[in-house]
Amino acid sequence: MLMGLAVSDQPEGPYRDLRTPWFDPGYSTIDGHLFVDADGTPWLYFSRNGRRDGYDYGTIYGVRLSDDLLSPVGEPVMLLEADQHWELEIRDWNRCNEGPAVWRDGDRYVMTYSANHFMYTGYGIGVARASHPLGPWTKDPANPLAASNPAIGVSGPGHNSVVLSPDGTERFMVYHAHADPAAPSADRVVYIDRLQRDPVSGWWRLHGPTRSPQPAPKG
């Protein structure tokens, strides 16, 4: 599986295919995330997924892109792999980091990502940070950022995008979780919850998952 690149003059489309495949590094690539830094430099983050030694794996890579977005500049660099305890609960058959989303927070870069198998109740979202787009990246020791909560009917929160409120003062995570917690599958429902920075550690915290009404975004 390889990624493609499509463009449009409007977010809602229509989109036209610009390049398919985008590029071929010689392995399967999914979950592409485009991040443009404050200086205009474009970066691509994606997941490499496959199978080795009897288990499925996923690792997160990053690479700088040409200014026209058409080609990688240099070779992709591996940034994250499953290495925290919560990411290795099913290590005998799955060791996965995938679904990266990156944004800039002052002089730091923040990445939110998914870990474990997408149909497993332990599928969740972690957070890491770095001082350069290609790392080294450090994971929050307090991960996961988002996890299943059977008490309120939330199972397997994963993948995500991070967006600002209309007035730019709040961050929100848009992510999905299993539609039926009693029978986890590829069917999902969408959640939106607030992110806030811990004033002591500097790490971002998710106020969720929630299933009750929340205050509207500011602005």
Regions found by a protein language model. Give the residues of each.
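Carbohydrate-active catalytic/glycan-binding domains of CAZyme proteins
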Residues: 1-219
